Amino acid sequence: MQLNKIKLALGFAAAATMAMPMVASAAADQEKAMSNANNWAHPRGQHDNQAYSKLTQVNKGNVKNLKAAWTFATGVNRGHEGSPLVIGNMMYVHTAFPNNVYALDLNNDQKIVWSYFPKQDPSVQAVLCCDNVNRGLGFGDGMIFLQQNDGQLVALDAKTGAKKWDVSNVDPKVGATNTNAPHVIKDKVLTGCSGAEFGVRCFMAAYNIADGSLAWKAMSTGPDSEVLIGADFNKENPLYSALSVYEDVNGGNKQGGSFKKIPTDQLQGGVADLGVKTWLKPQAVKDGWQHGGGSVWGWWPYDAKTNLVYYGTGNPSVWNPDVRPGDNKWSMTV
């Protein structure tokens, strides 16, 4: 596994090579809600993604006495991942495919205030990995954000459930899906991509919460310009940017030869476009990086002090490593 810190300026469309000022937060209501421990306004509680609650009513001394106070049946008998959101007296519940959303009034016997039922093509379930799950909802700027399994990112009015906007993030017809929870950070909503099992080239993307327009997209593989790698990338650890840990000794990069491991002290660091150059053998009619996987399905902590988002990419594609020798950057990377 390679360890690489990717710095993404959340207020801008491309990777920054210098300190950049942030725009004013459009999700001030999210920040206010998260400051109150009675709320759960982020899919993991806070931007640090630790899922830790400061509430003390339930503790190690009385947890054994907990009993169910009430239940709510979603009607979807598949894996339910991710917690509901709670903002004030409202609870927002999501389901596995077809990703229904319910807004419940906790002050009125959990009455359903509004509901949203996406119309998705059932065939998307055939390319979902690891059950038809959805990992949660996002909140900010008076909206609830849902990342549907079919790739549609949807913004719903938190009070009424009315759709404010939606945008297509991935295409299930090529094996790409979404199972992640949207993460709202300032004026952006971050989402990812799943599908490395099917040779999808995945990414992390940020959309403007005001209108759903794309702010930036960082691919998991490919040229530096598409991965959003800046000039100062891995400056302190250049060996993490080594060309390869293998040497092509018989034309394997294009013709199918043989490879041997390069001694650590002979690694060449600071090389550009490693997301292309470390895929040492083509698959079918394309170079491997063009369908190299690297799913991004969460979770993504944000550090407000440094303005950094940390995220990991998943396994390279295809599964068989014999047909994609090399480091396969930037899959399996932080």
What are the functions of these language-model segments?
Residues 1-25:
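Gram-negative bacterial Sec-dependent N-terminal signal peptides
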Residues 260-268, 272-333:
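Beta-propeller domains
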Residues 37-44, 79-100, 126-152, 177-201, ...:
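Repeat-blade elements of multi-bladed beta-propeller folds
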Residues 51-53, 103-106, 115, 125-127, ...:
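Short, solvent-exposed loop/turn and secondary-structure capping segments
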Residues 27-74, 111-126, 162-171, 213-222, ...:
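Aromatic (tryptophan-biased) beta-strands that constitute blades/sheets of beta-rich domains
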Residues 156, 161, 202-213, 327-334:
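Beta-propeller blade signature
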